[in-house]
Swiss-Prot record:
Listed pathway(s): Protein modification; protein ubiquitination
Gene: ATL35
The organism of origin for this protein: Arabidopsis thaliana
Keyword Transmembrane helix: yes
Spans traversing the lipid bilayer: 50-70
SMART domains found in the cross-reference section: RING
Keyword terms: Membrane, Metal-binding, Phosphoprotein, Signal, Transferase, Transmembrane, Transmembrane helix, Ubl conjugation pathway, Zinc, Zinc-finger
Record membrane topology: Single-pass membrane protein
Substrates-to-products reaction catalysed: S-ubiquitinyl-[E2 ubiquitin-conjugating enzyme]-L-cysteine + [acceptor protein]-L-lysine = [E2 ubiquitin-conjugating enzyme]-L-cysteine + N(6)-ubiquitinyl-[acceptor protein]-L-lysine
Gene3D superfamilies referenced in this protein's UniProt entry, alphabetically: Zinc/RING finger domain, C3HC4 (zinc finger)
Protein name (record): Putative RING-H2 finger protein ATL35
Length: 302
């Protein structure tokens, strides 16, 4: 619409008004005729031609001013519209799908027994408490956990954590925003987005797990994503199932190892306690026997 209006005004000025203006100026540049009759006719026609020329000039100037005003107005409106579109497009931009899928995913029942703190943990997006059979996605940079479906929709248009507004996007040169642990070698690479220390920031949106379990979740997620990108000789569905089942088995092994370690520690503590109790009892008995023997050795009072 703006381009059409500018073109129309330009055509009117160049093809209609400008020729009329030049035509009315022609009598003033012609040579003067020597006959008196022609001079009298020019004197009688001078006022009319002058008025017409002034009117045409005024119309030309007015249209030029209107064209300049419309050009500035429409140009400013176009610039503002373009800036608003860029702003909204940046605001709607979320995280890449590959980055979202790199965040660990698991069932709540698999880690429920190992979480730190009392009380339930709930999703900050739908405000529903987690149940055993629900699939969760864990944000390693801030340890906040959400339903996988809820956080996937959120991160499609946002790049921050819904609970703490931490920036989850990658910086240039980074591959993952959290530590990567190799299951075979046990090597760990830490960057500035390190995991939160245990016992800190315990709230209803934070799923705090032991540090070893955190590393296991990250590593198992890497195995699952690598198995999902197998060659096309295998179907994508089979690759996903094999990767997910393998990750589940390894996660169960890690949980069982953690539980067995806890049970062993508890049994050791109980054994040590029983040994201390037996030792104290035997020492008390020995002390009583010594006192009795000492009393027997003492001479009787006369």
């Amino acid at each position: 619409m703006t381009i059409f209006a500018r073109d129309l005004i330009y055509r009117i000025e160049t093809k209609v008004l400008l020729p009329l203006f030049l035509v009315h100026l022609l009598p003033y540049v012609t040579c003067q005729q020597e006959s008196e009759s022609v001079d009298r006719n020019r004197k009688t026609n001078f006022p009319t031609e002058t008025v017409i020329a002034i009117i045409v000039l005024a119309i030309f100037i007015s249209l030029s001013m209107v064209a300049c005003f419309l050009h500035k107005t429409f140009y400013r409106a176009e610039v503002e519209a373009a800036s608003q579109e860029v702003f909204h497009s940046r605001a709607r931009r979320g995280l890449e799908k590959e980055l979202v899928e790199s965040f660990p995913i698991f069932l709540y029942s698999e880690v429920k027994g190992l979480k730190i703190g009392k009380g339930g943990v709930e999703c900050a997006i739908c405000l529903s408490e987690f149940v055993d059979k629900e699939t969760l996605r864990w944000m390693p940079p801030c340890s906040h956990t959400f339903h996988a479906n809820c956080i996937d929709v959120w991160l499609s248009s946002q790049s921050t954590c819904p609970a703490c507004r931490a920036n989850l996007s990658l910086k240039p040169g980074e591959s993952y925003p959290y530590p990567i642990t190799d299951l075979e070698t046990g090597n760990e690479q830490r960057d500035e987005h390190s995991l939160l220390q245990l016992g800190t920031n315990l709230d209803r949106f934070t799923l705090q797990l032991p540090e070893e379990m955190q590393r296991q979740l990250v590593s198992l997620n890497l195995i699952r994503t690598s198995n999902m990108t197998l060659p096309r000789a295998m179907s994508s569905r089979q690759g996903y199932r094999s990767g997910f089942s393998h990750g589940r088995q390894t996660l169960r092994r890690a949980i069982s190892m953690s539980l067995s370690f806890s049970l062993q520690a508890a049994s050791v503590r109980s054994t040590v306690g029983r040994d201390d109790l037996v030792l104290e009892t035997s020492q008390a008995k020995d002390k009583d026997l010594c006192e009795q023997s000492f009393q027997h050795l003492m001479p009787e009072k006369v």
